[in-house]
Amino acid sequence: MLFSSCPLPLYASEASIVFPDTLSTPFKRYSLKPFMRPARKTVGIALSGGGANGIAQIGVLKALDEERIPVDYIAGTSMGAIIGGLYSCGYSPADLEIIAETLPWQSVLSIREENPRARIFLEQQRIRDRSTIAIRFDKLKLMIPKSLSSAQALTGTLDLLVLNGIYHSWQDFNSLPVQFRAVSTDLISGKRITLTSGSLSEAMRASSTIPVLFEPIERDGYRLVDGGLVANLPVDELDVVNASYKIAVDTHGSMYSKSGDLDLPWKAADQAISILTGLQYPAQLEKADLVITPDLQSHNATDFSDVKALIEAGYKKGRVLAGTIRRSIETRPVRETDIGSYNKSYLFDGGESANREHTGIVSGIVRNGTALNRTLTELLETDLFTSVYAVIDKPKKNIVFHLTPLPRIARITITGGPQGVLSIEEGETCFRPVIGQLYTNTTATRSLEDLVRLYRKKGYSLVEPQKVILSGDNLQVTMSSGMVNGIEIVQNRNSIGLTPILREIKIDTTTAIRSGKAEESAENLYETGVFSRVSLSAEKTPFIDDGSGRTLTFSLVEKPSSVLRLGLRYDETSNAQFLLDLRNENIGGTTSSFGGWIKAGKNNSVANLEFAMPRIGSTHFTLFSRLFFDQREFDTRDLRFSADFNGYDSDDIASYGIQRYGITGAFGTRIRKNGRLAIDFTLQNAQSYHATDSGPATLRTAELNLLSVGASLTIDSRNSAQIPTSGSYTHLSYTVTPELLDNDASFWQLSGIHEENIPLGSHTTLQLSGAAGISGSYMPLSEQFFLGGPGNAYSRRFIGLKQNDLIGNNMATAGLQLSYSPPFEIIFPASFLLQYNAGNVWEKRSDMSLSRLIHGIGTGIVWNTPAGPAKLTVSKGFAFLREEGDRESSSLRFSDTLWYFSLGHDF
């Protein structure tokens, strides 16, 4: 109970002081001054799980908020824990509604484990692009995944929402404005574990972790998963906190009724949990004083397509029952004093002249008052006063009501916080409802919260009111610094050194923490590829209230470093091929990788031993080296065109082989994560040969020992190497090979490739690409440019021609591709392609001419299968050629129609 600090006047011994019945639960929101609150029953809400159906709980909270029905306690499970946790840390129902409508639920709850391709190191992109299956080992022990996903997207989303909350806990959820409890299940013992302290976002995440789909949260020796397994509607948790009035919000919805509906693993998991929760409900519902069940009309728990309708369903049911709740939480005094016949008056602390606006409100309540406690309660319910009491003289039938109004505010001064962030006008806007006018305690609290929201919108997650002082009519608000006193790293294995971790953290502890930098730091750590989950928290340290008593904690769950990757591929040129890649991706705790990979097929074989340092220490320098062996055989033909649309299929085919082995190394600097500028060298034996029993040899072959040096720039921001829908790819390279070893002639090569992917809506992408390269007058066959076919590691894409149809010292090509990915599946997710390209190769730079261009057009379909992309394309090459002796006109000529098919990633 809060009392006025003003000295009480002296009264005759017959007079007595009567205080109103007030709420004993502490007020934990921001306020200008401590104030009395009228007595009522404490209100607790139990929020159930239910997946997407749980979104309806926001509508219930919205209805209660509009009816000014307070909530003192929340106990939540699964989605109820997420909504309840966010509500407890200061998000209003309006805030939650915006979050629910704008959050990309499908990606947040996705079981896809991979990082966005555009945000990982180039070496990691190449490794990931060519493999189909990845298997991890821990000290030669096969690590069988215990879940389909670590749920990093959900973890990161909840972390940032809690970090940007209006209030932060003191490592105890009872310190939040609404005391909070999250229910989870220990997967080992099956025990019910109620989380009441620690990281709020981790508690929400633990309570909503669907077994098998998401990785359990390890905490205090428990492996925590969805609380719906043991208590999907935790009404009994409200008994633990002694809530006087218990409301149950049941949004578990209905189960799937058809076997065909259970077509995905998460739907089966949801059905299993629904079966378990159905057994718990009768006992929990009996404990509730009121049950709110939104009309969800058999809505499925995995359907987030119509969030607005779900919120509206909860809102409608909440509005219907709000009146019942309001009446039920009222309290009546045990004994009441009749003051109807008393002489009644009132006194304001500060005098009546300074509180004239209050007079019109108070006079009516006092004049019409017939019961003492009821009148005191009505005065408090105006929310205009910090304290109210009465002095009653029963013998004289005289009563005086003493009221301490909220002080009048004429000016607002905001100090502290990060410098230059808020203008005077922005700060005053937050307090406009209280400056120079009558206001309530609730309005004052909302103004302070609006000030905090303004800082949150500007990206300052930890700035909050540190001191609020009323000096005369001047309100002085001192904001905290928004800084942390340190960064703590918590690892589950401690297998990674601090340098690779700290270099990815972009937090400056000498300045206010920015939410964008915190998010970037967490993403950077996850994108190194050595962590399965990265979470952050910034709970306050108890007993330190100067704004700096926080530690920013990064909790890291490390992956086993040994990885075996496998790949399979089939195409019409090389037939079946097999990939095996084995490497350690965290040598000595540095995140450097060492390993090798081999590829075996009918016409090619590759073996590589690689060492890569994505970053050297805390710098952006990078190092890469590789021992390699690469051997392939290929066919070439005499490319001809015919006036007949069916074209001309040449039988004049020659077979060649190229074999290279040696060592290459590169040193350079990172350009973000997906780019690199480097100098490199290659020492190799390069042998080209004409295969026996094939057509006549038209290409010059040789065996040479070569030492080449060069420089390259590579930037790859594509979201996919196969069918990208965004991003670009750029590669520029210059190489010179001097007359060394047994190389009789020096040569050089300059080339560039660029690809730009432009989204044309949510399902269509236009890809523009171009490549050009020039060389010295002499180039060994192994170093020349190869064009033709659908594109692979050896021959650049040129639709309408066979692989390796064009081989030369100089080349130029340009193309466009239009892809459409329908919203429905054709057995698997699919994309339709329409492609065009033009270009050619030339032996001499002086021969390069637009009049010699060859064109190709094609269309195809790509399926995204579990074994990798399956591509089927039909194409046609054509050219505008002049008849012999005709220099003025040209005619359209065609090559043969070609079909391309491949299954699996290109490696």
Go through each PLM region and give its residues.
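Flexible glycine-/small-residue-rich
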Residues: 184-187, 196, 294, 350, ...
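Buried hydrophobic packing residues in well-ordered domains
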Residues: 50, 80, 96, 190, ...
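Gram-negative/organellar outer-membrane beta-barrel architecture
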Residues: 410-429, 437, 441-454, 464, ...
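Acidic/histidine-enriched alpha-helical segments
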Residues: 256, 326-341, 396, 439-446, ...
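C-terminal outer-membrane beta-barrel translocator/porin domains of Gram-negative envelope proteins
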Residues: 699, 706-830, 834-838, 842-844, ...
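Patatin-like phospholipase
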Residues: 10-77, 85-399, 403-411, 446, ...
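C-terminal segment of classical bacterial N-terminal signal peptides
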Residues: 2-9
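Outer-membrane beta-barrel transmembrane domain signature
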Residues: 821, 838-857, 867, 879-883
